[in-house]
Amino acid sequence: MDVAIPQPPADQATEKAPMDALVIQGGRRLSGRVAISGAKNAALPVMAATLLAPGIHKLRNVPDLLDTRTFSRVLEKLGARVTFKGDLCTIDSSGVDSVEAPYELVKTMRASIYVLGPLLARMGGAKVSLPGGCAWGPRPVDLHLKGLAAMGANLDIEHGYIVGRDVKLRGTNFTFDVVSVGATAQLMMAATIAEGTTVLDNVAIEPDITVLGEVLNQCGARIEGLHTRRLVIHGV
């Protein structure tokens, strides 16, 4: 796979930061060039998707940030090899031989949960820390777990870890209770190499989802309905 991560939409180009006021003194002509990096929120699920297909994947225009570096460490814990050179991130996922994403890494970035679906689909098992550790009550990832369970994954929570063993994912029809970018990406990746056809309703339609779908299709996936609230994914 050799893909370029797109720039974030104008309304997502900067992260909100607390400030009292931003004062701009206008009246001067502007000229020159500025380089806009790729969108972090698009890059992270694409990095996770490399787990689905053993081989060398080259991702271009990847922002070199703490989050992308942390996510690369998660992939390396699983057995992948990751290198950064400028905005090029190269991931060799052929050596993935572990299914455990440890708490010390996952706790620093919730997006680490993205490895759960690909691991279940490719390896038939996973042991991924809950982003918040062993917490009681509703969890931010409950929608992820509900969707994966609908695909046949028997998941348990053990000592703060999501654990799946001897998993064989199968296509299903699933409707999200609420729109979730993270859960949509999770089930898209899992369904890509699951057995049969998966239909997802009330999915997120953010640019991050479109980018992920386009990248997966470029790699041989069969995903229909990008830009709409229904995705049809034929397992390959």
Question: Residue locations for each model-derived region?
Answer:
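Structural preference for solvent-exposed beta-strand-turn elements
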Residues: 1-236
